[in-house]
A protein has these predicted regions:
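S-adenosyl-L-methionine-dependent methyltransferase catalytic core, i.e., the SAM/SAH-binding region
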Residues: 1-339
Length: 339
């Protein structure tokens, strides 16, 4: 067996920015349906998906536990991530690179002759290289164009959007996607800017407009998060991704998803609850109330270890949610099924 790394792999990106993979061993073990990883962990056959390749930390470790006949489909919208993925695919024929959103996972897999997979993993949100590279516009600590697009080859940047959006809509975005309580005040200040070209200038305007700063947290944190989530349709993509897992995962297939803030985690939690509890209608007059099918079992949430948080501070807000697909075929009819 190939030696397993004892720490998260460093990025092999052509850029100078590195990335420490969060919940590395826990995620790979979960997507394989293993309690832990060691030298006795068997090689797994089948098809697997890394829905957010990034710099490939999870994928590289997972490949150590896949058989020669297995396939790993890696998705990402970011052209820089795709460059890294293509380098990996050139070295390992089991890797198939898909430059697309995980929201289009089913279509992309079907076009490649794949209708079901044995495991799906995703690491949501923005990556360390994206944050550390000021030119991408994600960071309020480094200067750059106000971009924030995951895929820089298409779509409108945040800076372009800010030029045309009205104050009320901007305030709604800051509140809905950043849970920013002072959204109206901040939106008014942002719309008072004469140009939208510098992330540091934008961050300073937000900072000055914010009436109450939380200790240890930059006042622009939630506003930058909100604009990034909105411009990339991140929550809509997550909803689509989760829904597709119902039909893509084979019986006993594994779903493992890492999130970094409450808006993401709440969606994943509610999705797994809805499809694992077999909810009953509220009708006490029924002698044997109909039950909805259970499409997932054993949902659980895993936090990073204290040791990982000490080494990688960015992991402190991460949560990994995992679940196992049941044998029940997915029924698109919303009416309850009788037991």
């Amino acid at each position: 067996m190939t030696d397993v790394p004892t720490s998260a792999p460093r990025s092999t990106s052509k850029s100078e920015f590195s990335h420490e993979t969060v919940l590395l061993f826990e995620t790979v073990a979960a997507v394989l349906g293993e309690k832990s990883l060691n030298d006795n962990t068997p090689k797994h056959d089948g098809n697997y998906v890394d829905a957010t390749f990034g710099r490939g930390g999870h994928s590289k470790l997972l490949l150590n536990y896949l058989s020669d006949d297995a396939k790993l489909f890696v998705f990402d919208k970011d052209p820089e991530a795709i460059d890294v993925a293509n380098d990996l695919a050139a070295e390992d024929k089991r890797v198939i690179v898909v430059h697309d959103s995980f929201a289009d996972m089913t279509q992309c897999l079907n076009s490649r002759g794949v209708s079901q997979v044995d495991g799906i993993m995703a690491d949501l949100g923005v990556s360390s290289p994206q944050l550390d590279d000021g030119s991408r516009g994600f960071s309020f600590m480094r200067d750059g164009a106000i971009d924030m697009r995951m895929d820089t080859s298409r779509g409108q940047s945040v800076g372009e959007w800010l030029q045309t959006v009205d104050e009320e809509t901007l305030a709604d975005v800051l509140y809905d996607f950043g849970e920013e309580r002072h959204s109206r005040r901040i939106a008014r200040a942002i719309k008072g800017m004469t140009q939208y070209t510098s992330t540091l200038e934008l961050a300073e305007v937000i900072k000055q407009a914010h009436p109450k700063w939380q200790k240890g947290k930059h006042p622009a944190t939630q506003s930058f998060q909100a604009m990034r989530i909105f411009i990339n349709n991140e929550l809509g993509d997550i909803d689509s991704f989760l829904a597709q897992s119902l039909t893509l995962l084979a019986p006993q297939g594994q779903l493992a998803v890492i999130s970094f803030h409450s808006l993401e985690d709440r969606r994943i939690k509610q999705f797994l609850q809805r499809h694992s509890r077999g909810q009953y209608p509220e009708d006490e007059n029924l002698p044997m109330p109909p039950q909805r099918p259970r499409y997932f079992s054993k949902p659980k949430r895993i936090a990073p270890s204290k040791a990982e948080v000490t080494v990688n501070n960015r992991s402190r807000s991460a949560w990994l949610r995992v679940a196992t697909r049941t044998d029940t075929p997915y029924n698109t009819d919303p009416s309850p099924q009788h037991s």
